[in-house]
Amino acid sequence: MLDPKFLRNELEATAESLATRGFILDVERLSKLEEKRKSLQVATEELQASRNAISKSIGQAKAKGEDVAPIMAQVGDLGSQLDSKKAELAELLEELNAIALSVPNLPDASAPIGKDESENVEVRRWGTIKEYGFEVKDHVELGETLGGLDFKSAVKITGSRFIIMKGQIARMHRALAQFMLDLHTTEHGYTETYVPLLVNEDSLMGTGQLPKFGEDLFHTKPATEEGQGLSLIPTAEVPLTNIARDTIIDEAELPVKLTAHTPCFRSEAGSYGRDTRGLIRQHQFDKVELVQLVKPEDSMAALDALTGHAEKVLEKLGLPYRTVILCTGDMGFGSSKTFDIEVWLPAQNTYREISSCSNMQDFQARRMQARYKAADAKKPALLHTLNGSGLAVGRTLVAVLENYQNEDGSITVPEVLRPYMGGLEKIG
């Protein structure tokens, strides 16, 4: 969430910045609520001071042998007024907090202003797009012909947007995840982490999925008097980042760099009719996630580095890609700046997103109270959090199947994956 003090003191500037994201901040409502908050705060403090002053006079009256009943009655009346004002203030603060939780992050000044994905800006391309001397097949046809992708059985067992993988294609899917983890842990300095696949509401609130995006989640257990509800993770970003929730990290331990390979679960609310064929948009998919916790002054350099770590996966696999910086109107709710990496898919004759790398600055950290303390600092300060896919495993499999297909329908195994597949050079 945004800094409440900044929001109050820079209301017009905040509204102007948020408008570039297509978010309309109700300035008039917030201004009225803020005036009411100030008034209630002053009234509460004055009542408290009056009650304290009169309470002190009780002892003096007793010492003089005076009747203290009228004073006691006055104290009681002030106490009732104070309780009423406190309750009113608490209700107002709850309303202000709910508004604050619904407001997206401010875009960084370096993010291009634009209304939607058509105004994203390409920053670089890598690799050469292969010319095929035959009609290319998409990953669905390739996978089904090889007996490695079974959509029909998945629909029968569960429903649409699920997959069963078998044989060497399932093995390649596993190999891709292992390769990614090995690359990030041995060359990029991340610590491999095993995390829960179920998270509570505090965790989802901390990373920004709640309260705004509850419909995108698979909820497995409702909240009860005994405890919070649990939901399946939409991304390992949630448990990885929440490791720092309500924690103060020593400056010497920064940066913290974590990676995890997990299944991810998304309802894909609002995606009806989009990417209904194949593995591009699934309710359950695997992803290798990258998370960094850094000092504020290091976060933009960390974003460039993290994006490079995700790009390196594609480079080692020999898959052409392009990287774009998202415009303000296309950024995620909690992001201040995002790079999307898009891999080339021959069957679609276009680039498709395979990774989104974002700097959240202190947006998540403020929600989570994730802080660090410098050796010479009197107080701890908020961390900056970053995350990105390194990569989405299913979409990477799609890219390998399509880019490495041969005319006879077989798939050449990329060299970097062969050690993970027992030296296998070709599928089919």
Curated annotation (Swiss-Prot):
Role this protein plays: Catalyzes the attachment of serine to tRNA(Ser). Is also able to aminoacylate tRNA(Sec) with serine, to form the misacylated tRNA L-seryl-tRNA(Sec), which will be further converted into selenocysteinyl-tRNA(Sec).
Cellular component GO terms held in the UniProt record: cytoplasm
Domain notes: Consists of two distinct domains, a catalytic core and a N-terminal extension that is involved in tRNA binding.
Pathway: Aminoacyl-tRNA biosynthesis; selenocysteinyl-tRNA(Sec) biosynthesis; L-seryl-tRNA(Sec) from L-serine and tRNA(Sec): step 1/1
Positions contributing to L-serine binding: 235-237, 289, 389
The name this protein goes by in its record: Serine--tRNA ligase
MF term (GO), any: ATP binding
Gene3D superfamilies: Bira Bifunctional Protein, Domain 2, Serine-tRNA synthetase, tRNA binding domain
GO BP terms, alphabetized: selenocysteine biosynthetic process; seryl-tRNA aminoacylation
Family: Belongs to the class-II aminoacyl-tRNA synthetase family. Type-1 seryl-tRNA synthetase subfamily.
Subunit and partners: Homodimer. The tRNA molecule binds across the dimer.
Known EC number: 6.1.1.11
Transmembrane region(s): none
Reactions listed under catalytic activity: tRNA(Ser) + L-serine + ATP = L-seryl-tRNA(Ser) + AMP + diphosphate + H(+); tRNA(Sec) + L-serine + ATP = L-seryl-tRNA(Sec) + AMP + diphosphate + H(+)
Primary subcellular site in the record, as a coarse category: cytoplasm
Biological source species: Shewanella woodyi (strain ATCC 51908 / MS32)
SUPFAM superfamilies in UniProt: Class II aaRS and biotin synthetases (SSF55681), tRNA-binding arm (SSF46589)
InterPro entries assigned to the protein according to its UniProt record, in alphabetical order: aa-tRNA-synt_IIb, aa-tRNA-synth_II, aa-tRNA-synth_II/BPL/LPL, Ser-tRNA-ligase_type_1, Ser-tRNA-synth_1_N, SerRS_1_N_sf, SerRS_core, tRNA-bd_arm
Binding of ATP, residues: 266-268, 353-356
Localization (cell): Cytoplasm
